[in-house]
A protein has these predicted regions:
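Long, charge-rich, low-complexity intrinsically disordered regions
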Residues: 1-105
């Protein structure tokens, strides 16, 4: 049996499909600020991944537990498999990354 879809999975999937924060909030019965918080944490995990920051250190930097960071990493691997796709996502979100931030492995 596979992994269960969490509200984080759903929120991020809807975002990656192009839905707005308000649309996601309505569909998931979340406050728009909560939706934005999930997306902001997801972006932060992506950035740290692209800079090759180990998950345990990312947890410390972001002030979240290692299990939460692992969950975001799983979501990241499910939806944004290629580092270029990760960079494109972050660029679309207004994040400017230098070329050397590209994680290739």
């Amino acid at each position: 049996m596979g992994r269960m879809l969490t509200h984080k999975d759903l929120i991020i999937r809807l975002h990656l499909q192009g839905h707005t924060t308000l649309e996601i909030a309505r569909q998931t019965h979340h406050n728009p600020k909560s939706v934005d918080a999930y997306l902001k944490t997801f972006d932060a995990v992506l950035i740290l991944h692209l800079y090759r920051v180990p998950p345990a250190l990312a947890a410390t930097i972001l002030g979240h537990g290692a299990n939460l960071i692992d969950e975001y990493h799983h979501i990241m691997r499910s939806y944004l498999k290629d580092p270029e796709v990760m960079r494109d996502h972050l660029t679309a979100r207004g994040v400017k990354l230098p070329a050397q931030a590209l994680h290739t492995g």
